[in-house]
């Protein structure tokens, strides 16, 4: 946004600072109007109608692009005419590899001193008044109405394609890894396919799958050896061993709350049975004087508890 604003403002200042054309220049411009129709910078149809189409008329944009493309082709044809005198140079330049041209130019610049390196001069000639007026109007609309050309372009239906980036690269034949440096300084295509992250990720995935498969096989083998079946004689011993192992494990797993309370055995008293023949009547003296007697039947058994 800021860069575009600066460009428009600089162009607007350029239009203000430009000197008014003299009558002679006007006459020359009138004579060259026919040439402009064929291949000038701006055609006559490129005028006020373009501003009315900025509101979103896509057909207007397409027509404008077609006109600009035709004009650029005409300009290229006109600029190429003076060079037609030297067909040998053109054929030699076409035969040479672009990388060789870049390398030779880079080598030539690297061997130059800083004082010899200069910025190329401005192109000769002036922009037409028609183009300057258009830039001035675009700048005024941006300042007053807040018009954003980038938003208008992005709102077009053609830019809603999710693969527009890849399509533009293919259409323009752009090398994303390319560079303007010569190969002796930097060669972006000098790396092998294994050096890129796609190949590294693929190799890593293969190794991880191998490790996961080996881990599953080890777990399966351990499980099978634990439940392997033997002969009938070994089956009985295996069952006995398994049962004893299970009991031992169960005893080991018992906590203090699972253990039974120890019971102390108490010796029971021994009961002695004595049979005695007693007289039919036993006289018991209840007092020292012997004044009262009690008769007790003496038939039966007398139980005596042994002393502990």
Curated annotation (Swiss-Prot):
Keyword Transmembrane: no
Subcellular location(s) per record: Nucleus
Compositionally biased residues, Acidic residues: 16-26, 57-78
Biased composition (Basic and acidic residues): 79-99
Pfam families recorded: HCNGP (PF07818)
A biological-process GO annotation: regulation of DNA-templated transcription
Keywords: Isopeptide bond, Nucleus, Phosphoprotein, Repressor, Transcription, Transcription regulation, Ubl conjugation
Modification Phosphoserine occurs at: 18, 22, 43, 52, 113
Superkingdom to which the source organism belongs: Eukaryota
Cross-link (Glycyl lysine isopeptide (Lys-Gly) (interchain with G-Cter in SUMO2)): 95, 220, 304-305
Chain intervals for the UniProt region annotation (Disordered): 15-101
Induction (record text): (Microbial infection) In fibroblasts by binding of HSV1.
GO cellular component, one term: nucleoplasm
Location (main, coarse): nucleus
Zinc in keyword set: no
Assembly and binders: Interacts with histone deacetylase complex subunit SAP30.
Function as written in the Swiss-Prot or TrEMBL entry: Plays a role in transcriptional repression by promoting histone deacetylase activity, leading to deacetylation of histone H3. May be involved in the regulation of beta-2-microglobulin genes. (Microbial infection) Involved in transcriptional repression of HHV-1 genes TK and gC.
Family assignment from sequence similarity: Belongs to the HCNGP family.
Name of the protein described by the UniProt record: SAP30-binding protein
């Amino acid at each position: 946004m800021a860069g575009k604003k600066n460009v428009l403002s600089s162009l607007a200042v350029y239009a203000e600072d430009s000197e008014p054309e003299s009558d002679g220049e006007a006459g020359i411009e009138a004579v060259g109007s026919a040439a402009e129709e064929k291949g000038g910078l701006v055609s006559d149809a490129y005028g006020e109608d373009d501003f009315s189409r900025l509101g979103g008329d896509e057909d207007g944009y397409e027509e404008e692009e077609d006109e600009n493309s035709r004009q650029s082709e005409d300009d290229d044809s006109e600029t190429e005419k003076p060079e037609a005198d030297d067909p040998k140079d053109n054929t030699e330049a076409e035969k040479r590899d672009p990388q060789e041209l870049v390398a030779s130019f880079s080598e030539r610049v690297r061997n130059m001193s800083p004082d010899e390196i200069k910025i190329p001069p401005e192109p000769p000639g002036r922009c037409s008044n028609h183009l300057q007026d258009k830039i001035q109007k675009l700048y005024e609309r941006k300042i007053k109405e807040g018009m954003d050309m980038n938003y208008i372009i992005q709102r077009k239906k053609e830019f809603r394609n999710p693969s527009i980036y890849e399509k533009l690269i293919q259409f323009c034949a752009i090398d994303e890894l390319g560079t303007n440096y010569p190969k002796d300084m930097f060669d972006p295509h000098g790396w092998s396919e294994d050096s890129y992250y796609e190949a590294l990720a693929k190799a890593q995935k293969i190794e991880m799958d191998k490790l996961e498969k080996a881990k599953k096989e080890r777990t399966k083998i351990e499980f099978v050896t634990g439940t392997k079946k033997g002969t009938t004689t070994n089956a009985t011993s295996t069952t006995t061993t398994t049962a004893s192992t299970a009991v031992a494990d169960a005893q080991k797993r018992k906590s203090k709350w699972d253990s039974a309370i120890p019971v102390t055995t108490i010796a029971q008293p021994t009961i002695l049975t004595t049979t005695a023949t007693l007289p039919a009547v036993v006289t018991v003296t209840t007092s020292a004087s012997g004044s009262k007697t009690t008769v007790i039947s003496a038939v039966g058994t007398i139980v005596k508890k042994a002393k502990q």
